[in-house]
Amino acid sequence: MKRIFCMMFLFALCLTFNQAHAQRCLPGMKGLQVTGGMADGVHWNSKSNFAYYFGAAMSTYTKNGNRWVIGGEYLEKHYPYKDWQIPVSQFTGEGGYYMNFLSDRKKTFFLSLGLSALAGYETSNWGDKLLPDGSTLTDKDGFVYGGALTLELESYITDRVVFLINARERCLFDSSVGKFHTQFGIGLKIIM
């Protein structure tokens, strides 16, 4: 039994030696990422302006760890009105470029600054303008457009799995409830 355990341990040890390290962020590499987090501050109380977001994107790396990103995002914010919460939802598509400006020698951590163009659709109370008390919402549903500035930290857990932490400021014009939204979130990226 001891011999079998020792052989299995040596076999597992040999599996780790054939991997090339630091083969990260090479031009042409692609990654699929999923992110989510809080928007416009952290509000856990149901009577406050609770807001969250989640999204998915595809990254394609270029030289020096820089990357092109294309994806989609959903943001929902609740506005209190009497005893109700009125949801405002934004569905946006993103296309942008993220520039790596800081990384360690072992290529484990990358800090990037990204600039993206956003376009999408915004709806208030899912299109229902008449509230239960007879009031009418004056916010109009419609298309929104703008941009986002993102600061993102990538931390490689393995050569194919990346943990993400990001902070982002979105500016969307033609929004009926506010142009700016600050987002803080985490995510996971799988390198393909």
Predicted regions and their residues:
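Gram-negative (and chloroplast) outer-membrane scaffold detector with strong preference
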Residues: A57-P132, V161, I190-M192
